[in-house]
Amino acid sequence: MCIRDSIDLYHQFDLLEYPVEILPDRALVKRQMSRWPTGLDPEVIAIRERNKERIISCLIKKIERRHSPSSRFQFAEGISYEEKEARVREWWNTARFHLSMAIKSPTELNFFLGYSLSDETMSLLARAKKKGMPFFVTPYYLSLLNIEHEGYDDATVRSYIMYSNELVDTYGSIKAWEKEDMVVADEPNAAGWLLPEGHNIHRRYPEVAILIPDSMGRACGGLCASCQRMYDFQSERLNFDFEALKPKESWDRKLRRLMRYFEEDAQLRDILITGGDALMSQNATLRKILEAVYKMAVRKRKANESRSEGEKYAELQRVRLGSRLLAYLPLRVTDELVGILREFKEKASAIGVSQFYIQTHFQSPLEVTPEARHAIEAILAAGWTITNQLVYTVSASRRGHTAKLRQTLNALGVVCYYTFSVKGFRENYAVYTPNSRSLQEAREEKIFGQVPEEKQAELYDMIRNQRPLGKCLVRFLKENGLLFAGTDRNVLNLPAIGKSMTFHTIGLTSEGKRILKFDHDGSRRHSPIIDQMGEVYIVENKSVAAYLRQLKEIGEDVNEYRTIWNYCEGETEPRFSIYEYPAYPFKATDRMTNLEL
């Protein structure tokens, strides 16, 4: 065992002899939160305006070099530079322009970043390109980075688009972390669910299934370096070839068949439309998908009329759209899109669907820009709830960072859902944060957003019914002495079934990595196969000592993390009530269909 990584063992024996009392410090957490600016701060906006000016000049040169007659983004012959600049400023406000002008190579990335990338970074990115790794960054998202010597720390944003050595080394052999995502025709997946052929439906739980459409929804507004579906980009099932991803005539027939799966299943009452990214689908495509979901829900409800009490099937109660575009490209949220969402909610509410979620992914308060604020306000006004999922990368795990993100999102009316530990294998080593740090954050920082039990019903009603939600939430937090609403659960997606943070540390590897024995989350329903599985054993991707060295390298005072060694056991937090399903006005069957054990 490496001596410097075996220090965990020393700390465990030391704690047996000298236990440490952990006393969360509200004033300290507030100071730590104040370190992190948001994309709404005037100083940040000023830097980004300068970024935008630089990027616009790059875009003019890019358009001048393009000779694609099919592109709508071209300059008329003979116009002046000022006219070109005015045209690009106009185009800047449309999502399609940013997708069309996305940066797709290391050389172009360096050009748009003012040649600020190091030789080492360029060499790494060139190696990634040679291995066939896709690059896709929109001008909008690139404008969020800071290439100036002064100003805000953009590490959390930057690490989402810059690849690590480990990711590049392993690309081509990356495997799915979650075994349920490996689908073989005519065979049950790891959770025991029988699924339609293809890769359109993924399922872990009895009550919810994921739908991945054959559309531009198989693309994203950018490629996250820690993407949980990197293996799908590797196989090119997900990609950035928008023309090839446009729905074919056969998709309409396939969609009807996929809807039958939801309609004829006894337990499904929640559909999560994702990808890729659900909002990458064109408006006409998204409208068709939602209409198909609506008609399926109507038929399922109608079929229940002939079923007796105790035999009735689950009816659709929740519809979710998974999208990171609120952070990656909020300009996608147009009046037309908002109209589609509003129209669907009004129709679906009339047939018993009561929960409508945009499940988004802000990683940093720096991603919460004026454009993102406008998109959030528009979606909330359409009657949908916006929930956030965070991936707890190294840069996002710095003291106060996640707390500040919660506070920033709450002020706009976004409620937090999950804080996910980074999953995966060696490919995610660079961004991996040990689970002990996630527990530490929950116990020492998130605790100052813990909603009192007697106030949870009030918060539930507010999120469901009151607008403008952001102002209502800020008032609620102030009245109850909370820094933010800690409605998210810190969890790990297990490689077997479901999410959990219930574990014991049972050993260390020769490299000092903790070996954790996980149990499943007992607060929710699982596939019956769980009774055959028992505990799940996971070797963490990185030792705690290596993680602390990494924090020190990026400027953190590791003394602020000294209690991390205490966190060797975890327990999954209770789910906030807004994430529970409502009760049925009838007795549904307990029988499970599409299941083979």
Please annotate each region the language model reported.
Residues 4-204:
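Flexible, acidic/Gly-rich N-terminal and inter-domain linker regions that tether
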Residues 4-6, 161-164, 170-212, 219, ...:
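Conserved Radical SAM active-site core
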Residues 125-133, 201, 246, 277-281, ...:
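Conserved aromatic-histidine-acidic binding/catalytic patches
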Residues 134-135, 141, 217-218, 278-280, ...:
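Gly/Ser/Thr-rich loops at beta-strand to alpha-helix junctions
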Residues 137, 443-597:
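C-terminal accessory regions of radical SAM enzymes
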Residues 227-229, 375-378, 534-535:
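Short, solvent-exposed amphipathic alpha-helical segments in soluble enzyme
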Residues 255-263, 276-451:
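Conserved AdoMet/S-adenosylmethionine-binding subsite of the radical SAM
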